Structures are given as C-alpha cells and as structure tokens.
Amino acid sequence: PYTTLFRSQAVIQGWYPDMTWQMMADAAFAVEAGATYFVTNRDLTIPRELGIAPGCGSMIRAVITATGVEPVASAGKPEAYMYDEARELNAAEGHDLVPKEASIAIGDRLDTDIEAGNRGDYDSLAVLTGVTNPTELMLAPSHLRPTFIAPDLRELGEAQPEPVRDESGTWECRKASAWFENGQVHVSDPTSMDGLRAAVCAAWEAADQGAQLSEATVPVFAIEA
C-alpha cells in the first residue's frame, strides 16, 4: 500500500486482471505525490470468450481521471518499440535481422496495433476477429489506417488484392466496387471483403479531400464467412 513514509519514484501500470480498487488508488496517490507515471499498453478493451471486457487502458484512464496526470510514456503499443524489439530479439538468437519491409504488424485494434505499425513505418494488417469493425475502418483517420485488411489470420498465406481507382473515381477490387457520391460512400457488395477493401479506399479518399464522413454516410457491412 502507498504510504507517505516511502514515496515511490515511479509508477508502472500494466495489464493485471486481478487489479483492485486499492491498487489503482495507491497508484493514484503515488502519481499525485510526484511519482513518474509509466504504462505498458493502452488498449481500452480486450476480447474475451463472453464478449468485450475492459482492458489495461480502461484501468489507466481511472488513474488519469483521479490525478489529472497523463503517463509520460507507454512501453507497448501504440509505440513501435515492441515491433522493433521483436526483430532485434529474433536477430539475437542467431538469425538475420528481418528488415522492416519484410515485416508486418498484425492486430485487431486500430488505435494500438495499427497505429504502432504506422509510427514505426511498418506495413500492417487489420483483422476483423477482435474489436475493429468495417465502419471503424472506413472512418479511420490517416494515422490509424492499415496497409491490408483481412477477416482473420488465415489470409496471411494469400495474396491481397489491390483496389484500383478508375478515371471516374470508382474504386474496384476484383468484382467489387465502391464510390463516393452526394456525401455518401456506396458499395456494390456489402457482404464481401473485396467490397470492404474498395469502400475503405473510397472513404479514405473522400475524407482526405475534406468530406465529413460518419456512420450515417458509409455502408453497413455484413461480411460473409
């Protein structure tokens, strides 16, 4: 427990599912007293068998709310250090250092997994098996946009189709197409991954050109398994 007799110099808050109110209170007391505040990751939620549960970031927010102090740094995502360290650890075991252009950041969260990849200049793959959904992908700001999109990890061994923009402004991905017209993103097939890939390109292009997109201006997807 925190005590004024032994002032902590630093607080490191990480993922601990058995964290109690008293633990968070002790962290807050120490931070308020001047301890430097570090965190390991800021995932607000975490997928579990029964649904979406609070993640490390939610518990971090409780301490931030109580103290008004933001962590000075995060050891995990959305910083890219973890990806750099993974490459270096692999090389330390006697393997060649894998270049960034031969690496890919994979995850289900845009604001941690994918942002970390973008910060570190890694290609990234967003999968739909966790918290990110098609709407969030279409509305993603530039720093949260993945290089590739897949329904799950099974597509890692398959070539990704590249959406192509034609002269009319329509984005095509194999047999699916998407376009922006009258303030709306339209898609030919809202049940396929290719439709989503095309729609994402149309939405991002429109947003980058100043369009104000929202859930009401992008199509609803129901991706078929």
Where are these regions (language model features)?
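Active-site glycine- and acidic-residue-rich loops that bind
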Residues: 14-24
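Glycine/Thr-rich beta-alpha phosphate-binding loop at enzyme active sites
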Residues: 40-81
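Catalytic cores of secreted or luminal carbohydrate-active enzymes
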Residues: 142-161
